[in-house]
A protein has these predicted regions:
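A bilobed periplasmic-binding-protein/Venus flytrap-type ligand-binding module shared by bacterial periplasmic
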Residues: 1-2, 115-131, 146
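Secondary-structure end/capping motifs
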Residues: 128-239
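A polyampholytic, Gly/Pro-enriched intrinsically disordered region
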Residues: 83-88, 125-130, 135
């Protein structure tokens, strides 16, 4: 999935995907605040990981990282309440369309085909009404496969590009959903091709791999949200692997055997070993 980290045009000298240039600009211009959607959420992790990869500690650099609801991101950038933000589409595209921002890097540049959203329920619901939960999961499987077809991108943009859903224009949504990015800031265009935002990818996208959870917990330690790693058994407690496998079989969806495979993070050329998350948690 490709999501942008846009910044106001005042930081456009940072270029696209250039960590050295971005670091130089951030250190010179000293932005006081950057935004993400929710503390500990994926967009928070992408932003903090990007800064870490440049050797920038937001506290030492005097950068406040603050939560802003996704639909309010552009207005906060436009009003200079923040100088940049990490959020899902189409709010990155809006900054480009309005000429107020550019895409500095996308989450696909950080970690290709990374995990994102999850279906989360209470233990009570999962235990007391498994039939309804299974129906919801089957519906999601069906929707994911439909959304993954490039031919359905225009219709998807029209369906969700209305006030009661995303409240953005279909034009803002469609190009990024298709993986065709105008980066803004005079940085040209980029076509992500097969690395565009995906929803199924033969069952790979929807697979709740324990390694993903362990990677996130390691980042929580790196970024100061946790003082130490929880027991790794927590992954098995939180992920209902047996239920997923059962519903996937009903839907004819392949369950990958990569749940504990190493993860390759492109941005800083690291490999995460899920059997030893402490190694990642201890990394500067």
């Amino acid at each position: 999935r490709a999501e942008g980290l846009p910044h106001g045009v005042v930081l456009a000298d940072a270029g696209y995907g250039d960590l050295d240039a971005a670091k130089a600009v951030l250190e010179e211009r000293k932005p006081k605040s950057l935004a993400m959607t929710f503390p500990g959420g994926t967009h928070d992790l992408w932003l903090r990981y990007w800064l870490k990869a440049m050797g920038i500690d937001p506290v030492d650099a005097g950068i406040e990282i603050k939560p802003v609801p996704p639909p309010d991101m552009f207005n906060n950038l436009n009003q200079e309440n923040v100088r940049g933000y990490s959020v899902g589409e189409p709010w990155n595209a809006r900054a480009v369309v309005k000429g107020k921002g550019f895409t500095a890097i996308t989450s696909q540049d950080i970690w290709a085909n990374h995990p994102e959203k999850a279906l989360v329920t209470s233990t009570g619901f999962a235990d007391e009404d498994p039939e309804t939960l299974e129906k919801v999961m089957l519906a999601i499987f069906e929707a994911q496969q439909w959304l993954d077809d490039p031919a359905n991108v225009p219709e998807t943009a029209k369906i969700i590009g209305v006030p009661k859903y995303v409240n953005a224009t279909p034009e803002e949504i469609e190009s990024r959903l298709a993986g065709a990015y105008d980066l803004g800031g005079g940085h040209g265009e980029k076509d992500f091709g097969d690395l565009r935002m995906r929803f199924f990818r033969d069952g790979e996208v929807c697979f709740p791999a324990p390694s993903y959870l362990l990677w996130a917990m390691a980042q929580y330690v790196r970024f100061g949200y946790l003082t130490e790693l929880p027991d790794t058994a927590l992954a098995d407690e939180l992920i209902l692997s047996d239920l997923y496998a059962s519903v996937a079989a009903t839907a004819g969806v392949t369950v990958p055997d990569t749940g504990m495979a190493p993860l390759e993070i492109a941005l800083d050329d690291t490999t995460f070993d899920p059997t030893d998350p402490q190694q990642e948690a201890s990394r500067p």
